Amino acid sequence: MKNYILAIFLVIGMVNANAQVKTSAQEVAPELVKQREELKTLIITNYLGIKNSLVVSDSKKTAAAASEFSANFGKFKFKKLTLEEMNAATTARKSIKELADSIAIAPSINEQRKLMEKLSEKFWVIIDKVKPENMPLYQQKCPMMGTTWVSNEKKIENPYYPKNMLTCGEVIAEK
């Protein structure tokens, strides 16, 4: 009988210990969520920095924004994915980082634009995983040239042909 009562107290003690662990994990989670959202916002801001620098044809700012994008994107950890999704996302991240690094060292604005076309296509594929909450993003396309880019507004500012076709484009998707 004593062993039975002792076992009950042990089980109650274990349940209480688990409840305390859960409470402590719940207290940490909001801070981690906040940090993750801040990193997502920074990644999108860095991407938009590349795009906007290309719109004004500033090769140096484009290179700096690409370096920041690469560094911050490299810190991002994908969450809640199946093994197959994780493999695809990890492969995409590697490719996107390599493209951003190439933009940062590209010798000309035209080369940066060519690389940005590839980066934008790959980035849109995983945009759901890096998009901050409550931030609408738009995939835009220049129908004459077939190039796409991501923007945080519906207004068209074509980063690939700003001199001749600044407003050439349309929103083709929204997330």
Regions found by a protein language model. Name each.
Residues 1-25:
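Bacterial Sec-dependent N-terminal signal peptides
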Residues 25-175:
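Mature extracytoplasmic or organellar-lumen-exposed domains after removal of signal/transit peptides
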